[in-house]
Amino acid sequence: MSGWDEGAVFYSDQAQFPRGGPGGDPSADLTRHSALRKFKEFLRGFTGPTGDFPYRESLVHNRDHVTVAIEDLDAFDAELSDKIRKSPADYLPLFETAASEVLASLRSKVAGETGEMEEPASGDVQIFLSSKENCLSMRSIGADYMSKLVKIAGITIAASRVKAKATHVTLLCKNCRSVKTVPCRPGLGGAIVPRSCDHVPQPGEEPCPLDPWIAVPDKSKYVDLQTLKLQENPEDVPTGELPRNMLLSVDRHLVQTIVPGTRLTVIGIYSVYQASANQKGAVGVKQPYIRVVGLEQSRDANSNGPSNFTLDEEMEFKEFAQRPDAYVKICSMIGPSIYGHSDVKKAIACLLFGGSKKRLPDGVRLRGDIHVLLLGDPSTAKSQFLKFVEKTAPIAVYTSGKGSSAAGLTASVIRDGSSREFYLEGGAMVLADGGVVCIDEFDKMRPEDRVAIHEAMEQQTISIAKAGITTVLNSRTSVLAAANPIAGRYDDLKTAQDNIDLQTTILSRFDLIFIVKDVRMYDQDKRIASHIIKVHASGAAASSKNTDASEGENWLKRYIEYCRVTCKPRLSEKAAEMLQNKYVEIRQKMRQQAHETGRAAAIPITVRQLEAIIRLSESLAKMRLTSVATPEHVEEAFRLFNVSTVDAARSGINEHLNLSPDIANEIKQAEAQIKRRMGIGSHISERRLIDELNRMGMNESIVRRALLIMHQRDEVEYKRERHVIVRKA
């Protein structure tokens, strides 16, 4: 049988991937050569809807990277896109090799046409992937997705410094000085170093020992690597659960493109790494992370991007904006289960829509976000409003003042356990960038923590200079805060200064300040009681209609989103002139009031308040999708400003003026008794003094009013949280 195979040539494809096709049949899978060829054909020959060659042109104009849509790969070759989805770690390096080769051939052709034969620039081309598929939930990603392509959305809460990651490590044998280069696994993977040297010893030569290799850093090849921490979007976290985090690894041209607080949509390879080598018996337990191969920053207040409005939705929104009762209808959707408070609802509607951001020629940014403070008695639905806004705003973070520190609200510097380096982690004001921060119990915050949000409220940035990290984070958020007066309830016998225990610096940053009082009126109490009983009685029926309510909330959320993205109104000339006159008039009234009472207003009326009225006017125009704010919008903005901030500034000031002769006489008698009871410099408990004068037949409210007037004349002073009175004169 000799010579039976003469003349035939047999070969084996050594480049076959280690994984075979289904059933272990290698022929059913793509070979390395055929995959490389198909990738080249795709980059060269794929045509867009207009007949152009998008990827070929992209490579010529940008030699470093090219973004490939998986949907285009699907249309070109379904098998190829399937391989990219299921085995991205194997096929993406091939794709990048194909891109480098296509770029080299294209550049040599371009050089040939000009008549100058240049050597084509060789270099690695990074492939970025993009997809229009829906994002997976962070909680749903498990072992089934290992080594596959996944797409998730979230908000960046931390970013590490850039490190150098070796792609090829050069090893030197300590014994025979021979050199070997071994590749490194991409992402957070390391290199596999052989135990023995390849050198064959000569007769009489001592063989190389085990583990003879030492790394030569100067001869190794590196790429930039950065790790990010991605957290679930606040609106996606189930109630009562902590938000989940995912570690991301970005390299080459993706490093230093993301700052904490940025909302991202990420495509990457779900991988694992060994977190710590010190854990005994945990060799098989690995930590998951995502090696990013494509990311997209979400625009404005929408984690899915603003382009996902259908034509039907846009038509519906535009029709709604043309309705004469659009403003009233929107306000009725704010807190529908809350009775009354129509002006507060209108203010919250303005806060949700926001004004227009502006950038001046000298680079200064003027904020468009509106801040609202609700100050008043308990059980006046303040927290209900905050909870409603948290559900309705496209981006919202809810926090309580007592449980919030300065670092938790702004940003903290944390030391990484493994690398011992510091990195930034954004707080509530950073995470809500482009949305609303709801702060309950605002008055219970420590003053040093409250000061931390001054810059975030006006300049819309947070400056950090800690542990060698000096940076500025964006914090373009609206603040909706709720607070109680000093004594828990608003005391009409006290001035606004005595009721509001907040500094002027923080009060001037709020555009609207509402004093919400629990007024005891028979008819109103009856209507409120009837409304609350109906809400509770129809609870069972309402649960079946819950879908309708949630649909209404979703519609409002989408409408707010659409208005914020598409409409940027500006003031008309008539509106600007009217605004100027009204502002000067308000300042004049406040100056006159301060002159009459001898005390400055508790809530200052400054240029910030003028800007607040401009923002309110723009917000009212934005609700109607109009590009110009008219005098009618300015009129309504002034009305809101008058019933909130101006009323709050005036409240309690003239309480002791224009008293009836009988009451004035009683107050004088009370003052005389107080002076007889207390010598100059002596002190007494307020409660004890009131009880003693009560036993003498004096009304408690008269005694309190007398103390208030004496305090204003600086004759008595309060100490120990207003529990003790000291007579001064």
UniProtKB/Swiss-Prot annotation:
Name of this protein: DNA replication licensing factor MCM5
Subcellular location: Nucleus
Functional description taken from the UniProt entry: Probable component of the MCM2-7 complex (MCM complex) that may function as a DNA helicase and which is essential to undergo a single round of replication initiation and elongation per cell cycle in eukaryotic cells.
Source organism phylogeny: Eukaryota, Viridiplantae, Streptophyta, Embryophyta, Tracheophyta
Similarity section: Belongs to the MCM family.
Recorded GO MF terms: 3'-5' DNA helicase activity; ATP binding; ATP hydrolysis activity; DNA replication origin binding; single-stranded DNA binding; single-stranded DNA helicase activity
E.C. numbers: 3.6.4.12
Record's subunit section: Component of the minichromosome maintenance (MCM) complex, a heterotetramer composed of MCM2, MCM3, MCM4, MCM5, MCM6 and MCM7.
